[in-house]
Amino acid sequence: MTKKYNIAVIGATGNVGRETLNILAERNFPINKVYAIASDSSLGREVSFGEKILQINSLKSLHFDDIDIAFFCAGSEVSKEFIPKATASNCVVIDKSSLFRVDNQVPLIVPEVNLSTLKEFNTKNIIANPNCIVIPLAVALKPLDNEIKIKRVVISTYQSVSGAGKAGMDELYDQTKSKYVFGENDPKKFPKQIAFNIFPHIGDLNKDGYTSEEAKIASELNKIIGNHFKASVTSVRVPVFIGHSISVNIEFNDKIDAKEVEEILQDADGIVTISNNNYLAYISPVEVVGEDAVYVSRIRNDVSRDNTINLWITCDNLRKGAALNSVQIAEELINNYL
């Protein structure tokens, strides 16, 4: 008989929390009972879980003794306050905030890349889910690095507003609507107008000129893949609702060409490659909404630098960039560790 688990999704009314519930249902995760948890302001609301409707429960009233696995999807402050309570009750936590990602005692997992490090989870009973840009980057970069070591990476991200939560999506919608009726809608969630605009500012601005988002991406990539290369990152917010895209310039330590890169990626787990032989041979954000794969296209040689490749990565940031990755981690946990 298949063992079933009690699951809690904390932040169940947010973008990632709702998607986590959707994916748990889609993939028939063996659940005995599922708890949809959010702040007190969300009490009385309902969320979908497959064909079922779940009532929102309060985090403050949740008994972690009753929970086997908790998905934390509510940000670093909530994680900081409540994860110690969860782990003290022997609940395994999969945390989607940035709080534990660079903690050396907490594995930072992308299942296609570094599942072998998952065995370290029981040091703290916490597994960290990487940044929503780092996940597709790691899926694409690791199989290449396995073949020929990467020397450096230059990354420009084009991140949708859903990465900033429902408030970010609402702000894009409201500003767009206001522009069509000649109204004004001042930015609240974002530092500048997002409708019909882009800006290279995600997270806080650091003293070195990089943003906190850019620093996270570089440090998390090194933790997952290795410290033998450096990454220079520019993170850009774009007026797209769902779907992150990434322009990547990769310099290798040895000779490689675009054809070889394409062949390596075609054999890699979790990737769909688009050949340059096709007309419109690239994937845009609207095409990946609801998709689980990481799409890689525009694979080409950098004509300005030897041993260097350019490519374009696109994925659904709410699915593989967040919720799906964490559910895949949970599947591995119950198959081999719990």
From Swiss-Prot:
Please name the Gene3D superfamilies in this protein's record.
Dihydrodipicolinate Reductase, domain 2, NAD(P)-binding Rossmann-like Domain
Q: Which residues bind phosphate?
A: R101, K216
- A Pfam family (short name) is Semialdhyde_dhC
The pathway where this protein functions is: Amino-acid biosynthesis; L-lysine biosynthesis via DAP pathway; (S)-tetrahydrodipicolinate from L-aspartate: step 2/4; Amino-acid biosynthesis; L-methionine biosynthesis via de novo pathway; L-homoserine from L-aspartate: step 2/3; Amino-acid biosynthesis; L-threonine biosynthesis; L-threonine from L-aspartate: step 2/5
List the active-site residues.
C132 (acyl-thioester intermediate), H244 (proton acceptor)
HAMAP family from the entry?
ASADH
The entry's substrate-binding residues are: Q159, R237
Where does this protein hold NADP(+)? T13, G14, N15, V16, S41, S42, S162, G163, P187, N317
Designated name of the protein: Aspartate-semialdehyde dehydrogenase
Q: Which UniProt keywords apply?
A: Amino-acid biosynthesis, Diaminopimelate biosynthesis, Lysine biosynthesis, Methionine biosynthesis, NADP, Oxidoreductase, Threonine biosynthesis
A GO molecular-function term, please? Answer: NAD binding
The taxonomic lineage of its organism, from the top, reads:
Bacteria, Pseudomonadati, Pseudomonadota, Alphaproteobacteria, Rickettsiales
